Amino acid sequence: MVDTESPICPLSPLEADDLESPLSEEFLQEMGNIQEISQSIGEDSSGSFSFTEYQYLGSGPGSDGSVITDTLSPAPSPSSVTHPAAPGGAEEPSSVALNIECRICGDRASGYHYGVHACEGCKGFFRRTIRLKLAYDKCDRSCKIQKKNRNKCQYCRFHKCLSVGMSHNAIRFGRMPRSEKAKLKAEILTCEQDPEDAETADLKSLAKRIYEAYLKNFNMNKVKARVILAGKASNNPPFVIHDMETLCMAEKTLVAKLVANGIQNKEAEVRIFHCCQCTSVETVTELTEFAKSIPGFANLDLNDQVTLLKYGVYEAIFAMLSSVMNKDGMLVAYGNGFITREFLKSLRKPFCDIMEPKFDFAMKFNALELDDSDISLFVAAIICCGDRPGLLNVGHIEKMQEGIVHVLKLHLQTNHPDNIFLFPKLLQKMADLRQLVTEHAQLVQVIKKTESDAALHPLLQEIYRDMY
């Protein structure tokens, strides 16, 4: 029989057990002639076999000790032997070394032997065992085979050879196919890749997933809003609401459905407050669907999901509201209308106090120049906040938030490399939003007590209950 090998590096010196063994001569000899193993030959990358393409190394012409070698790159050949050019161009320089470990003992592999990458020592050990049909004393200790102790337990060493896939039937002639060589190099590069690179890839994947969920679940985003506010939209510009007359016109067209069922007969402030609630309810629904797309959220206890949304939705709403605001006003009715800041300030108390704090926050928030990918992670971090009152699985939720905040930090470093203070500024905005929501909830309670016509939507009433 003949062993076929594909050297990866220069052959290592013979082991002590090979030199001292009466089988050392066999270590250098072939295990039969070529014809005896013709049935075991695997096809090379070209799918055909030609003896003239391979190099024979032995003690001389006619020697029984010829060794057929499968190289990763062209090996020096005797002048009497010629080799046709490999299909597809010349082989790579011999200096290219694939630093692969022996699958049996972990030493440096010298080539592809008997179906696996193995060192010279383990290759020779397996060859002798197979050829001479050696039987070793059984060992039940499952010895760990390493370079330093591989000669101690022959039974376990042979068992390891078999377990990793060494087989006499895996003998192969010729050079390693280019496709297999390329695959090996790719595997090596993957194994040698910095663990931090793999972690970064996972974090980028998480950021992408959250961003895509954000774009999918929200009707309005910053990109759309900025196009409209800049007057670059392809359709008609938004209808501007700047006084009572234009408000009435908008109510007959843009928000006709919202002011039906008797609402149209109430005063302007109550009608505006009602429309604001309708928009908030719709956004809460969108936020709920978005939250389900955050990895791990849907697996939380249902009570924890409700608690996170109860305390997080308004912070998220006011963060996203900044996208549709500028210093002069804000988009309404899906971007089809624009209500001026001055008109909202002209409403009677306490309604005139509802939106002005949101404009103040929005101007500072917009100054950070975040895009939708940044905002999506920011909103996800707001929702998955582990310090909300009444949570059951605090530790798990805190871990979720830590992961999202870490992704947010890395994303900001990539997306805004010149703004090193953006991340801490954004964390401060989380605290600012809590204060903003607290003040808003208090104002809503005042309206609830003093304005009999300004009824609260049941869903929002449940959110406000026991909030602060």
Curated annotation (Swiss-Prot):
Alphabetical list of InterPro entries matching this protein: 1Cnucl_rcpt, NHR-like_dom_sf, Nucl_hrmn_rcpt_lig-bd, Nuclear_hormone_rcpt_NR1, Nuclear_hrmn_rcpt, PPAR-alpha, Znf_hrmn_rcpt, Znf_NHR/GATA
Assembly with partners or alone: Heterodimer; with RXRA. This heterodimerization is required for DNA binding and transactivation activity. Interacts with NCOA3 coactivator. Interacts with CITED2; the interaction stimulates its transcriptional activity. Also interacts with PPARBP in vitro. Interacts with AKAP13, LPIN1, PRDM16 and coactivator NCOA6. Interacts with ASXL1 and ASXL2. Interacts with PER2. Interacts with SIRT1; the interaction seems to be modulated by NAD(+) levels. Interacts with CRY1 and CRY2.
Zinc finger intervals, NR C4-type: 102-122, 139-161
Annotated site residues (Essential for heterodimerization with RXRA) in this chain: 433
UniProt-annotated stretches for the region Required for heterodimerization with RXRA: 304-433
GO MF terms, alphabetically ordered: DNA binding; DNA-binding transcription factor activity; DNA-binding transcription repressor activity, RNA polymerase II-specific; lipid binding; nuclear receptor activity; RNA polymerase II cis-regulatory region sequence-specific DNA binding; sequence-specific DNA binding; signaling receptor activity
GO cellular component, one term: nucleus
UniProt superkingdom: Eukaryota
Protein name: Peroxisome proliferator-activated receptor alpha
Biased composition regions of type Polar residues, renumbered to the chain: 66-82
Compartments, record wording: Nucleus
Presence of keyword Ribosomal protein: no
Signal peptide per UniProt: none
First-listed, main subcellular location of the protein, grouped into a coarse class: nucleus
